[in-house]
């Protein structure tokens, strides 16, 4: 007769394996609109760990990319130091507007050279929000995009509740791809 637990039975049981969640860093230029939308998007899609940071200097694409590069490197160093590869980011995204920034091509190149993705809003993030609600008539100036958004969202003032836009996400993606194709024909960044 054996008292206690059956050792062979205990060794055969393993705790269920759960793959670590993907860790994504998003660095954006906007203090309110972009950050609020992206944080809401991250909460809605709970399958990843998304860390949204606002660039140190708002509104400058090169600063967004430099901050993302620095944060990516800090996470990689922490992962190496702690011996925990899950501290590294699986993906790094830089989110900025085209607006009238003169150094967008350099920012795109720096991001690509550092294995970072870019979500470029051309001309501005408000166009992305607008695409959730209706099709764009084509290439717009940022002031026109903002004006159209304010007509559709009466209380819009550089502040976003993601749930107001979630239902239109799939349509926004399709509409953005169409605009991207038009931009390529016009030889503009998408």
Question: Predicted regions: what is each one?
Answer:
Residues 29-31:
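Helix N-cap/beta->alpha junction signal
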Residues 2-4, 9-25, 35, 39-56, ...:
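C-terminal accessory helical subdomains adjacent to catalytic cores in phosphodiester-
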Residues 54-82:
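A broadly used, surface-exposed interaction patch
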């Amino acid at each position: 007769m054996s008292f206690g637990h059956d050792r062979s039975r205990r060794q055969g049981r393993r705790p269920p394996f759960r793959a670590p969640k993907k860790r994504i860093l998003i660095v954006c230029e906007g203090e309110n609109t972009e950050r609020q939308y992206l944080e809401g998007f991250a909460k809605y899609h709970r399958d990843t760990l998304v860390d949204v940071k606002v660039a140190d200097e708002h509104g400058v694409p090169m600063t967004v990319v430099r901050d993302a590069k620095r944060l990516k490197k800090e996470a990689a160093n922490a992962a190496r130091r702690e011996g925990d590869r899950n501290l590294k980011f699986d993906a790094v995204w830089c989110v900025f507007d085209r607006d009238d920034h003169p150094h967008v091509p350099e920012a795109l190149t720096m991001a690509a050279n550092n294995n970072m993705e870019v979500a470029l809003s051309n001309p501005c993030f408000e166009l992305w929000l607008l695409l959730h609600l209706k099709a764009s008539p084509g290439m717009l100036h940022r002031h026109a995009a903002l004006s159209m958004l304010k007509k559709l969202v009466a209380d819009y003032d550089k502040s976003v509740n993601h749930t107001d836009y979630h239902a239109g996400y799939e349509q926004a993606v399709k509409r953005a791809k169409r605009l991207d194709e038009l931009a390529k024909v016009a030889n503009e960044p998408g």
